[in-house]
Swiss-Prot record:
GO biological process terms, semicolon-separated: sucrose metabolic process
Superkingdom per UniProt: Eukaryota
Keywords recorded for this protein, A-Z: Cell membrane, Membrane, Phosphoprotein, Sugar transport, Symport, Transmembrane, Transmembrane helix, Transport
Organism whose genome encodes this protein: Arabidopsis thaliana (Mouse-ear cress)
Protein name per Swiss-Prot or TrEMBL: Putative sucrose transport protein SUC6
PTM sites of type Phosphoserine: S17
GO molecular function: sucrose transmembrane transporter activity; symporter activity
Pathway(s) this gene product operates in, as recorded in its UniProt entry: Glycan biosynthesis; sucrose metabolism
């Protein structure tokens, strides 16, 4: 009886895949895969702005540091629900425009809506009654949170179908799948560099002088200007890719089972019939993101608060110190992205020389653990310097160089995190006959659930130990070390 049920579950998982890679006449040319992968540059431009500017911005709107992580919780929640849903429905989409292209187009339009809400949150809040001098601008915070939620929904609506589209175009070719995902990671790096460069340029608002208003200061105006550039890039690369790359209309095979399986039945069916290699991949991915998310959430805040000794809630001098640290953190993230880009292009060759993906992934997780642990040393050196030179003293060149070096080195494991898990999931799903969209949606669940855990836990943990960022980073270092051991020992 259990074997019969397992077979039914397997049929449910595989039913939507009747045209995943088999209906393409072999792999598509690499230039088409690169065109689709380039959408990642537009996605990541906006994501880079989220990571580098929005945590400080929401604190300027009046949200305390320990609660800002709860606003970020909307990202993991939307990822948990949206990406598997989009994967499921895109696997089954019968639109004449193809399976993936309608979802990619819808995601790009949602990004445009979100950018307007986020960029103009302070202005909308002021027009609804927020006072410029009040510490907590509640209406602006609500509008910001709504825009932030929509932006995360849009990013998940875009990213899942893009990666699934690459899997479709690779048509089961393992090497092309790895290469396509490496290019996706490379274009993420390109988007990061552009986003962090824009975020670190303090006079960008002068290009769009209308962005500065009574309710929106220079920092806010720069944020608006950055998002205008972001949505322009995203729309350009998306339009080019959707026009250039054909996405064949899907229709079920004549001999396929036409019974419709509910979405949640399909998800649970996927977990029931999942083979050991996929389970091991999910475990390592989950540990990896427990390690990453505290740093991705608070990296620039760490530069402004711990390294530079500033405070977003302090007097003008402390705010100035904090903003200086934020902008240097933006430079660090740009260096991180440059390393990420070069590493992405070399993943295939390095993986072969090291003897496979599990050795490479395990090795770079050691780098991740060491770098996260070293943030403690950099912070202590900065605090010691301020005790000697005075609380308003800028960090020494050595301290600043040490912090920027950590940012740069973290680009190495980040390239692997953005590439190898998705390539392995695509390869495993192709070999098992599962739909690309659903398989990548299941993988995404092991990314966003750890993010939810971190979002709930890191703020209170940081507050318990004095309100800084180091406790979350130390938890990340421990998780990275564990993920390295697991990658070496259990990945196939």
């Amino acid at each position: 009886m259990s074997d019969l049920q397992a077979n039914k579950d397997a049929a449910a998982v595989n039913r939507q895949s009747s045209s995943s890679s088999a209906d393409l006449n072999g792999p598509s040319p690499m230039r088409k895969m690169i065109s689709v992968a380039s959408i990642a540059a537009g996605i990541q431009f906006g994501w880079a702005l989220q990571l580098s500017l929005l945590t400080p911005y929401v604190q300027l709107l009046g949200v305390p540091h320990k609660w800002s992580s709860f606003i970020w919780l909307c990202g993991p929640v939307s990822g948990l629900l949206v990406q598997p849903s989009v994967g499921y429905f895109s696997d089954r989409c019968k639109s004449r425009f193809g399976r993936r292209r309608p979802f990619i187009a819808m995601g790009a339009l949602l990004v445009a809506v979100a950018v307007v809400l986020i960029g103009y949150a302070a202005d909308f809040g002021h027009s609804m009654g927020d006072k410029v001098d009040e510490p907590v601008k509640m209406r602006a915070v609500v509008i910001f949170a709504l825009g932030f939620w929509i932006l995360d929904v849009a990013n998940n609506t875009l990213q899942g179908p893009c990666r699934a589209f690459l899997g479709d175009l690779a048509a089961g070719d393992a090497k092309k799948t790895r290469t396509a995902n490496a290019f996706f990671s490379f274009f993420m790096a390109v988007g990061n560099v552009l986003g962090y460069a824009a975020g670190s340029y303090t006079n960008l608002y002068k290009i769009f002088p209308f962005t500065m208003t009574k309710a929106c200061d220079i920092y806010c105006a720069n944020l608006k200007s950055c998002f205008f550039l972001s949505i322009t890039l995203l729309l350009v690369v998306t339009i080019i890719a959707l026009w250039y790359v054909e996405d064949k209309q899907w229709s079920p095979k004549a001999d396929s089972d036409n019974e419709k399986t509910p979405f949640f039945g399909e998800i649970f069916g996927a977990f029931k019939v999942m083979k050991r290699p996929m389970w091991m991949l999910l475990i390592v991915t989950a540990l990896n993101w427990i390690a990453w998310f505290p740093f991705l959430l608070y990296d620039t805040d760490w530069m402004g608060r711990e390294v530079y000794g500033g405070d977003s809630k302090g007097d003008d001098k402390m705010k100035k110190l904090y903003n200086q640290g934020i902008h240097v953190g933006g430079l660090g993230l740009m260096l991180n992205s440059i390393v990420l880009g070069f590493m992405s292009l070399g993943i295939e060759g390095i993986s072969r020389k090291m003897g496979g993906a599990k050795r490479l992934w395990g090795a770079v997780n050691i780098i991740l653990a060491v770098c996260l642990a070293m943030t403690v040393l950099v912070t202590k050196k900065a605090e010691e310097h301020r005790r000697i030179a005075g609380p308003m003293a800028l960090p020494t060149d050595g301290i600043r160089a040490g912090a920027l070096t950590l940012f740069a080195l973290l680009g190495i494991p980040l390239a692997i995190t953005f590439s190898i898990p998705f390539a392995l999931a695509s390869i495993i799903s192709s070999s098992s006959g599962a739909g690309q969209g659903l398989s990548l949606g299941v993988l995404n669940m092991t990314i966003v659930i750890p993010q939810m855990v971190v979002s709930f836990g890191v703020g209170p943990i940081d507050a318990l130990f004095g309100g800084g960022n180091l406790p979350g980073f130390v938890v990340g270092a421990i998780a990275a070390a564990i993920s390295s051991v697991v990658a070496f020992s259990v990945l196939p």
